Amino acid sequence: SGYVSHRGIRHEDVTATSFASASLDVVMSFDVLEHVPRYEAAFAETCRVLRPGGHFLWTAPFRRNQEKTIKRATTTETGEITHLLTPQYHGDPLRPDAGVLCFQEFGWSVLDELKEAGFEKSVVVLTWSWSNVNLGPELITIRAQKSL
């Protein structure tokens, strides 16, 4: 499913990558998973390609006061989008006029969903730093580890 663009940039479907099983030590994803309709499949695929003890580091909008992940939209088997809430679009530097649909807003239940996908441990890391001039809201990173 993966390919390399004419600019040398690798593109993969996070729900069905072309990487071999247990071939990567670390997978990182930054502000992508909220745009993936079947994010649970992306979790399972990431676990598949990680070596035992490998780490999955990712960021996405995370609602720390929200227990459950909220589905904003879904897709049918034919790819048709069904909106469950008012559509929310995030900025897209490649298509600034269009934006990218947000399918979900993650809550604390995502830690259980990562476990269901095969990760042994997962934590939410809140980072704020005066010395590094990260003075706004905390940066929220989720770290999951595949069992050894």
Where do the language-model regions lie?
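S-adenosyl-L-methionine-dependent methyltransferase catalytic module, highlighting the catalytic core
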Residues: 6-11, 40-148
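Active-site micro-motifs of SAM-dependent methyltransferase domains
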Residues: 16, 34, 64
